[in-house]
Amino acid sequence: MLYGKQLSACASFAGFLAVAVCGILPVLAQNSSEDVHIQPRVQAAAPKEPDIDPAFKTHTKPLKVDVNMVLVPVTITDPLNRLVTGLDRENFNLFEGKDQQEIKTFSSEDAPVSIGVIFDMSGSMGGKIERAREAVIQFFKTANPQDEFFMITFSDKPEEIADFTSSVDDIQGRLIYTVPKGRTALLDAIYLGVTKMRQAKYPKKALLIISDGGDNHSRYTEGEIKSMVKEADILIYAIGLYDHYFPTEEERLGPALLSDVTELTGGRAFTIDNPNDLADVSTKIGIELRNQYVIGYRPKNPVRDGKWRKIKVKLSPPKGLPPLRVYAKTGYYAPTE
């Protein structure tokens, strides 16, 4: 996890801190718009009206990946939790089950992303809402002009307040008029976010969850949501803002819930206790999405049996580097057709 002191230290740098081996660069999150390498977007047309039923009464057909090519986004960090760039194809080894796979494609380019923001508007967010809104704004500043976004807010139930759009201003404008109230239907909001992402136009997809607690008002269970995100080819990131001194029961369970859900997808969960750190963490997540490796392989097992197949990415880093950590999705469901 990235704690407040580390974030402050990272944010004070003006650029990148070079690792003196083989040109490997740990990428640090920045605060100001001048520090972001992507230029601001041009205003786009207003989004269309949402067409997903907010009641989402029934499960939809599980997502399946094309068994002929599996794409695995990978994030690498150093012991100080900084992003590590500059690695090559030969530094990665990928396994499906016990069988090593041949890497067919390898990229570290900044590709457009379809992004959904899941924003907690429950009553307990009342004193933190302005910082949380600022965090969303900072996250958007790391986007590139081709990205598309949608936003879901949730309290007693989730609500899609902005359909897919490239207009950051439109989403920010809608967020201003939301009022914190009610309980926390986090799991239902994740369900709606994953369902909505089926309309995404880009192969790379990500959800960002901003919440101050666990769940206390959802119809879907934790097990159902974990099964769903395993079926979806979506990176999930989360920022959990918790009171470590007087936590509620939901807050005590919240960090583990977010960590478990994000880990399945190759994303990460960040836990903080100071609302002032929200903007720094959201910027870090945005930059991380721009500095990932994407590995593609064709499974040696061609059987279309619909079964869960475990994935493991291992590193063979250049000599002299400290221990590095790998974040990647844990597997995928093979198709049946």
Segments (PLM) and residue ranges:
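N-terminal secretory signal peptides that target proteins for export/translocation
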Residues: 1-10
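Compact, basic/aliphatic-enriched, mixed alpha/beta core segments that act as assembly/interaction modules
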Residues: 2, 15-18, 297-300
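Scaffold/interface architecture of coatomer-like assemblies
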Residues: 29-337
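Generic low-polarity alpha-helical segments
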Residues: 1, 28-29
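Bacterial N-terminal signal peptides
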Residues: 12-26
